[in-house]
Amino acid sequence: MNFGKLLHFLNYTDRSYYDVYIPSKTAIKTEYVNNKKTDIQYILRVYENRILIAFRGTDSCRDMMSNLQFFKKTVCHMPDSKKIRIHSGFYKAYTEAKIFDKIVKVITDKTKRIEITGHSYGGALALICAADLAHRFPDIEYEVVVFGTPRTGNKAFAEFFDKYLPNTSRIENRGDIITKLPPPLFGYRHVGKTYRIGSYHIPFFYSFKEHSLCSYRHKILK
């Protein structure tokens, strides 16, 4: 992946952790969304023909509870819906926050490209959001870059990305334990192209320390 592009997505993911966001002079609209009911935070930035969405990662006990709900849920409105299943905790949080309803209001006939990013739990939300938008707005160009993201859906979900969202990249810090969850034993699969950074300090040793966005930034800029 191009380093400049990687840094672009990393910077916006980093900014999603700020509670106050400074508007851009070049954007038509910049909004920091904090849904207190679901404890989901994300940045929504709108340009004339482009939209950028950046989701914050795990930031509270509520987020952790969503992460631990390993059961999968069938998604009825997507192609091959009988086969596609998504992590129930992530999907419930996404739908309850009405993220799609918020984004669809800023999509216009001029919208040609949507960029979506996120870290950790926010990366999982970014993937669900991308799949939802790509299904409903197939003529728009999408680019998705996520950092330290857990497995979010099953094999059919991964195949959906291969077909409809081929420009999806997953950045994985070697040693990041969250990227190993939920286990494949539960039927979960990663999506998109995988780019691994860093190195193992001890073979097959994973930790939460390697999961922080600061660790990702350090390894990328090193």
What are these regions (language model features)?
Residues 1-117, 121-222:
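Non-catalytic, mobile gating and regulatory segments of ester bond hydrolases
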